[in-house]
A protein has these predicted regions:
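Alpha-helical transmembrane segments of multi-pass membrane proteins
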Residues: 67-72, 125-153, 163
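C-terminal transmembrane helix end/exit motif
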Residues: 1-20, 151-155, 181, 199-212
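Transmembrane-helix boundary and interhelical linker motifs in polytopic inner-membrane proteins
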Residues: 75-106
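Interfacial/gating helices of multi-pass transporter permease domains
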Residues: 44-70
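Alpha-helical transmembrane segments and their helix-entry boundary regions
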Residues: 27, 99-100, 158-165, 191
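Hydrophobic alpha-helical transmembrane segments
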Residues: 165-211
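N-terminal membrane topogenesis motif
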Residues: 1-41, 60-64
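Alpha-helical transmembrane segments of multi-pass membrane transport and lipid-handling proteins
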Residues: 81, 105-128
Length: 212
């Protein structure tokens, strides 16, 4: 979060209650965006399930799949976050911006391979069907890239753009999930597809910001 921290520091230097509240608000939403999106999606999914006749088993299965995947991705990326943050700070200090982007893809590939193997083994013994295993693994991969990208975002000023990406991701996920259920796709698969689409939107947005 080095780059985010540098820019948020400028907001905190501004005086006034409104400026301070704005800085804290941006810091909270930006740094916890993926997890916040997960919580909102879980609430939205529960609402959709209640109004579309989903069984209790399906609701609990969805909650477990999403929660376990979130926790697994956070656990894997946490082992690298401190090293990544220190490296970003050093490269920015030395004004070697090209090294930051190249290391992003290198660290992302490493996290995807190591994390994907570990989580893939877990899914094999989880007891869920093959389609759900694939959706969970895809969701896990998106989360890995998203968490890592959040550590690499540098010199960000378009905070409103980031917030819009969060809101758009939630809206699209819930809308797509509802539509997929309406056309007859089972609840678990429909809503997992919707969640991967939602986080996919945020992933693409974050990676795009890295190249601005």
């Amino acid at each position: 979060m080095a780059g985010i921290g540098f820019e948020l520091k400028k907001l905190f230097q501004k005086r006034g209650l409104a400026a301070t509240a704005k800085a804290y608000g941006y810091a909270g939403v930006i740094c916890t965006g993926p997890m916040l999106l997960g919580i909102v999606l879980l609430v939205g999914i529960a609402f959709i399930c209640d109004h579309t006749g989903a069984t209790r088993h399906n609701r609990e299965l969805l909650n477990c799949m999403i929660t376990y995947t979130l926790l697994a991705s956070l656990t894997v990326t946490s082992f690298f976050s401190m090293v990544v943050t220190r490296y970003i700070a050093d490269m920015l200090y030395e004004e070697r911006h090209e090294a930051v982007l190249s290391s992003f893809w290198g660290s992302t590939a490493l996290l995807l391979v190591v994390g994907g193997i570990m989580y893939g083994i877990f899914l094999l013994f989880s007891g869920i069907n093959l389609i759900d295993q694939f959706l969970c693994l895809e969701f896990f991969g998106e989360l890995i890239v998203t968490w890592n990208a959040m550590s690499y975002l540098t010199a960000i000023k378009d905070y409103k753009g980031i917030l819009i990406s969060f809101i758009t991701a939630v809206a699209v996920s819930l809308l797509v999930g509802f539509l997929l259920i309406l056309i007859g796709i089972p609840h678990v698969e429909a809503l997992m597809i919707a969640v991967t689409i939602g986080y996919g939107i945020m992933l693409l947005w974050d990676v795009t910001l890295l190249y601005r």
